[in-house]
Amino acid sequence: MIGERGWRLLAPLLIGALFLALWEAAVRLRDIPPYILPAPSAVALSLWNDGPSLLGSLFVTLRITLAALAAAALIGGAIALLFSRSRILELSLFPYAVILQVTPIVAIAPLIIIWVQQPFLALLVCAWIVAFFPIVSNTTVGLNSADRNLLALFRLYGASPGQTLLYLRLPTALPYFLAGLRISGGLALIGAVVAEFVAGTGGAETGLAFRILEAGYRLAIPRLFAALFLLSLTGIVIYLLLDWLSRRVLRHWHESAAAAEEE
């Protein structure tokens, strides 16, 4: 008898297998050319043949993604701490964080690439801009969500601001921070890919976005789909790893993680 946990893994795999089978059948029965829509088997063959070059490019994109995520976590967390310490500072600077978030990165990436001469750093800045806001926003909310009764109790016992931050505000904000981190993981990958599209540079330090552009120009559509598959798989792995980290950190004391463990 398959339990709920088994179905959580099995059901998506069955749906995916059914989708791929229908896709393969449709391409073969309708004789669709591979430069319009390749069959999954053609994509798998391209992934096998072009695997070394695609994986090398994926490593470049992944390096930018992880660096941007780490920078977003550190800088975003620090900004949230500053906001929690000063309401005036939050009211003054938070609107500009919103502006950065809602401005399409594809519109400002060319300027960043021009202003920042070092290519890796320019791509890192673009990915960071996309990734940092969920961490700032969520962590700020978490730091400001400490229970008022507990805050009053800390004041009653003469706790210093540092003690209140360490023993009350930070534990309260941790689930919010981890939720923002899960969101930012995917956004960092998106930002890195968009920045690579705009930069459009080849060479040894070529990211996966350039491989997609190159495949599109050459009508190597199976290779394009193979690169897209690697990007999607990378995004899923990043999310699952961050979700696992969140559950590991919270499972012994936070209700959300404890409830998930019991299911």
Description of each model-found segment:
Residues 246-263:
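Short cytosolic juxtamembrane segments of multi-pass membrane proteins
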Residues 138-177, 212:
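Short cytoplasmic-facing helical segments at TM-TM junctions of multi-pass membrane proteins
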Residues 98-134, 141-142:
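Generic hydrophobic transmembrane alpha-helix motif, especially the helices
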Residues 67-97:
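Transmembrane-helix boundary motif in ABC transporter permease subunits
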Residues 7-29:
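N-terminal signal-anchor transmembrane alpha helix
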Residues 207-244:
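Hydrophobic alpha-helical transmembrane segments of polytopic membrane proteins
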